[in-house]
Amino acid sequence: MDPIDNSSFEINYDHYGTMDPNIPADGIHLPKRQPGDVAALIIYSVVFLVGVPGNALVVWVTAFEARRAVNAIWFLNLAVADLLSCLALPVLFTTVLNHNYWYFDATACIVLPSLILLNMYASILLLATISADRFLLVFKPIWCQKVRGTGLAWMACGVAWVLALLLTIPSFVYREAYKDFYSEHTVCGINYGGGSFPKEKAVAILRLMVGFVLPLLTLNICYTFLLLRTWSRKATRSTKTLKVVMAVVICFFIFWLPYQVTGVMIAWLPPSSPTLKRVEKLNSLCVSLAYINCCVNPIIYVMAGQGFHGRLLRSLPSIIRNALSEDSVGRDSKTFTPSTTDTSTRKSQAV
């Protein structure tokens, strides 16, 4: 069998492997830890400690409401996506701590790092679905009163998850564990095969456009119309969920921006570029910043749930339940309340 051509292993923004000719082959002297890696370790720790219990609490609260409330279905699926990513953090933490060497099996190399991409696609597709729901509630209230229900919501979430899995396929297909030529340690990386540069560019473009640019443009247009309609009609009764969703959307784009920028730069810069080496040093930090998005949503829900005095008197589940509860659409619909939109008394909402 021909020896592996290590030149085909390109450093990419969705893995944590590295190939550094400055590392001694005997592996005795480990490379100096980069400041970005130190920051990433701190961020991973905080995200895990906040994200796992926070998202688990949201899942627990919304699971009881999901049978009758559309909003609960949206936020339940968001929390599940974030929780899955947070559960992979101990493995990623260990990898960064060990200078990006991989000490787990090949299956874990394929699955666990890919969870961050699955989270990205699932989150943005779910946010787009939630935003479309908000848009229709404001501009088509009568249609929503007749059609909107839990069955349709579950179907929309199912479509979002299937699309997210399909978009994550390149990471599953091209990711593998291999022996680093210089250090003889195992590295979890991406192998696009011969002539990998065009494939790497194509994957980077797909990730940028589907996971960031197109959703950003679409959601900006959507929320511009929603805000104009809300302000013009002073529909203050329907703004609670709108504010929560907008906060979640804004945080998504803020925390994923560094990840997307460095990803495109790594895909486009030639291997010999000095700039590429500098960008690669920020890779772990940018991934960790994207991970912050996995723990920030429960914090938003708590902040939006009640006033500060109310927070002191109410339990966290009650606060989250209040933040994610259904609200009326405002003046456009006279009786558009949870009882008329989400209960089983509406006509059948078959999936």
Swiss-Prot record:
Modified residues (Sulfotyrosine): 13, 16
Entry's transmembrane regions: 38-64, 70-93, 111-132, 154-174, 202-227, 244-266, 284-304
Gene3D superfamilies linked to this entry: Rhodopsin 7-helix transmembrane proteins (1.20.1070.10)
Membrane topology category: Multi-pass membrane protein
Side Extracellular, residues: 1-37, 94-110, 175-201, 267-283
Pfam families, alphabetized: 7tm_1
Phosphoserine modification, residue list: 315, 318, 325, 328, 333, 339
Chain segments carrying region Disordered: 329-351
GO BP, sorted A to Z: amyloid-beta clearance; astrocyte activation; cognition; defense response to Gram-positive bacterium; G protein-coupled receptor signaling pathway; microglial cell activation; mRNA transcription by RNA polymerase II; neutrophil chemotaxis
Name of this protein: C5a anaphylatoxin chemotactic receptor 1
Organism: Mus musculus (Mouse)
Bias kind Low complexity: ranges: 335-351
Keyword Transmembrane found: yes
PTM summary: Sulfation plays a critical role in the association of C5aR with C5a, but no significant role in the ability of the receptor to transduce a signal and mobilize calcium in response to a small peptide agonist. Phosphorylated on serine residues in response to C5a binding, resulting in internalization of the receptor and short-term desensitization to C5a.
Keywords: Cell membrane, Chemotaxis, Cytoplasmic vesicle, Disulfide bond, G-protein coupled receptor, Glycoprotein, Membrane, Phosphoprotein, Receptor, Sulfation, Transducer, Transmembrane, Transmembrane helix
Sugar attachment sites: 6
Gene Ontology CC: one annotated term: basolateral plasma membrane
Keyword 4Fe-4S recorded: no
Alphabetized InterPro entries for the sequence: Anphylx_rcpt_C3a/C5a1-2, Formyl_rcpt-rel, GPCR_Rhodpsn, GPCR_Rhodpsn_7TM
Function summary: Receptor for the chemotactic and inflammatory peptide anaphylatoxin C5a. The ligand interacts with at least two sites on the receptor: a high-affinity site on the extracellular N-terminus, and a second site in the transmembrane region which activates downstream signaling events. Receptor activation stimulates chemotaxis, granule enzyme release, intracellular calcium release and superoxide anion production.
Positions of disulphide bridges: 109-188
Listed GO MF terms: complement component C5a receptor activity; G protein-coupled receptor activity
Family assignment from sequence similarity: Belongs to the G-protein coupled receptor 1 family.
Ranges facing Cytoplasmic side: 65-69, 133-153, 228-243, 305-351
Gene name in the database record: C5ar1
Quaternary structure, from the entry: Homodimer. May also form higher-order oligomers. Interacts (when phosphorylated) with ARRB1 and ARRB2; the interaction is associated with internalization of C5aR.
Localization (cell): Cell membrane; Cytoplasmic vesicle
Domain of life of the organism encoding this protein: Eukaryota
